[in-house]
Each structure stands twice: as structure tokens, then as C-alpha cells.
Curated annotation (Swiss-Prot):
One of the record's GO cellular component terms: ribosome
PANTHER family in UniProt: 40S RIBOSOMAL PROTEIN S14/30S RIBOSOMAL PROTEIN S11 (PTHR11759)
MF terms (GO), sorted A to Z: rRNA binding; structural constituent of ribosome
Family: Belongs to the universal ribosomal protein uS11 family.
Name of the gene: rpsK
Organism: Vibrio cholerae serotype O1 (strain ATCC 39541 / Classical Ogawa 395 / O395)
Function: Located on the platform of the 30S subunit, it bridges several disparate RNA helices of the 16S rRNA. Forms part of the Shine-Dalgarno cleft in the 70S ribosome.
Recorded superkingdom: Bacteria
SUPFAM superfamilies named in the record: Translational machinery components
Identification of the protein by name: Small ribosomal subunit protein uS11
Upper classification of the organism: Bacteria, Pseudomonadati, Pseudomonadota, Gammaproteobacteria, Vibrionales
Quaternary assembly: Part of the 30S ribosomal subunit. Interacts with proteins S7 and S18. Binds to IF-3.
Keywords: Ribonucleoprotein, Ribosomal protein, RNA-binding, rRNA-binding
GO biological process: translation
Entries under InterPro entries matching the protein: Ribosomal_uS11, Ribosomal_uS11_bac-type, Ribosomal_uS11_CS, Ribosomal_uS11_sf
Matching NCBIfam families: PRK05309.1 (NF003698), uS11_bact (TIGR03632)
Length: 129
């Protein structure tokens, strides 16, 4: 006897009005994650995953493209307001926030949550080029 074909149900996306954009801007890459208020990830994108490799990955433009891609995915959830949390010293800090603003989100506040050590690990030695 043949198996009855199971119908694939269309997944219903939950509607979220407010979210948090977590931006991790390192010297080598920028990671943008948009979550709901509870911290459940809705969408994420990276500069490396957006088609930039090598030294181009660590540019403000690559971070901007990653933020735009992440914003497109997050719009499917009906997001309107964003709180932005920025971590790290990388070059994509400012351009990512500008891209999220240009994508149509209302940015309620911006928090700089860069971890600062209380004299923890020894930093990398200075480059000699």
C-alpha cells in the first residue's frame, strides 16, 4: 500500500514589534544578530557571509551590507523598533547602526557594551610592518 503524502505546513512566523540588534564588531569581521526582547535570535548576518573575504571583510562597507541583509530577514517578523547593543572596537560599528536606521527601523537607544578588562589577559604585541 502506498504511503499517504504528508502535506507540508507553511511555517507561521511570530510577529514581534520590538527587538534588539546585537552588533559584534571585531577587527576582522562584523556579526549582526537581531533578537526579540527575550534574546531569541530572529535573524543574523556576517560580513564574511555576505560575500566579503580577507581584508575586505573588515571594512565598514562589509558591515553595512551585513546589517542590510539582517534587516531584510528581520522585517519578515514585523519588527518596527530596535534597541542597538554594540560590542567591540572594529571598523563596522557606526556604519552598521546607520544601515539599520536606513532600513526603516526606529532605533530607540544605542548601548556600547564593549567588554573592557580590569587588567586581564595580555594584549597582542604591536605589529611591525
Amino acid at each position: 500500500m502506498a504511503k499517504q503524502p504528508t502535506r507540508a505546513r507553511k511555517r507561521v512566523r511570530k510577529q514581534v514589534a520590538d527587538g534588539v540588534a546585537h552588533i559584534h564588531a571585531s577587527f576582522n569581521n562584523t556579526i549582526v544578530t537581531i533578537t526579540d526582547r527575550q534574546g531569541n535570535a530572529l535573524a543574523w548576518a556576517t560580513a564574511g557571509g555576505s560575500g566579503f573575504r580577507g581584508s575586505r571583510k573588515s571594512t565598514p562597507f562589509a558591515a553595512q551590507v551585513a546589517a542590510e541583509r539582517c534587516a531584510e530577514m528581520a522585517k519578515e517578523y514585523g519588527l518596527k523598533n530596535l534597541e542597538v547593543m554594540v560590542k567591540g572596537p572594529g571598523p563596522g560599528r557606526e556604519s552598521t547602526v546607520r544601515a539599520l536606521n536606513a532600513a526603516g527601523f526606529r532605533i530607540t537607544n544605542i548601548v556600547d557594551a564593549t567588554p573592557i578588562p580590569h587588567n586581564g589577559c595580555r594584549p597582542p604585541k604591536k605589529r611591525r610592518v
